[in-house]
Each structure stands twice: as C-alpha cells, then as structure tokens.
Amino acid sequence: MTCVTGGFYDEKCYFEISGHACRENDGEYGMPTELDGGEPLACAAVSVLVMTALEKVRALDSDGAFSSASVTVEPGYACFDLETREEYADEVRHAFEFILLGFELLEENYPECVSVA
C-alpha cells in the first residue's frame, strides 16, 4: 500500500509518499506476476506521479522558487519538504494540487493499493 500525506501551510509545502502499491513477490517489490487487483497499473502510476513531482520541483528550483528545498526519492519512499518564496507560492500550490489529484484518483480506483490522508 502506498500512503500519501502532506499539504500546504502558508509558503510551506510538504508531501510524503511511502510504501509500495504492489505486493511483495519473490522477496522483492515490483511488478506482480499476475494482473490481479490493478496492482501493476497503480504501481506504475505512483511512480509516474512521483517522478512528475520531482521534475516539477527541479524546474521550479532552477527558477529560484524555493528559499529551502529538501527532496528525498528512493525505492518505496519520497519526501518533498519545500519552503516557497512568496511570489511562487501559487504556482507551487497548483502544481502539487494537480499531482495530489492524481493520487486521489488512484485511491478512488485502487483503494487497496493507494491511500491519501
């Protein structure tokens, strides 16, 4: 199960994505051997959303949007802890609201794989 938590607090943006949308198979997390329960789709979609968020943060960071930015992305875990400059606050909020919408749609369609708190 992938769990998504976080939100916006003034100019602060914090999101944490943890866990795997796929069950464990043969000692490793990854693509299940059978297409059951939508797991392969949910797993791939979670990966795409995390990588999209990462690329958006990189682009915004190169524009000087953050006064501080801490980003961790590793297998089964991603954390975005961003302090946004006031003039970029709306752009950052809209970007992460869009990505959060993607996670909410996954939760709606694959509740056994994704949870948004």
Language model features with spans:
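N-terminal intrinsically disordered, cationic/polar leader segments
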Residues: 1-41, 55-117
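A short, polar/charged loop-to-alpha-helix boundary motif
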Residues: 44
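Conserved ATP-binding N-box helix of the HATPase_c
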Residues: 47-56
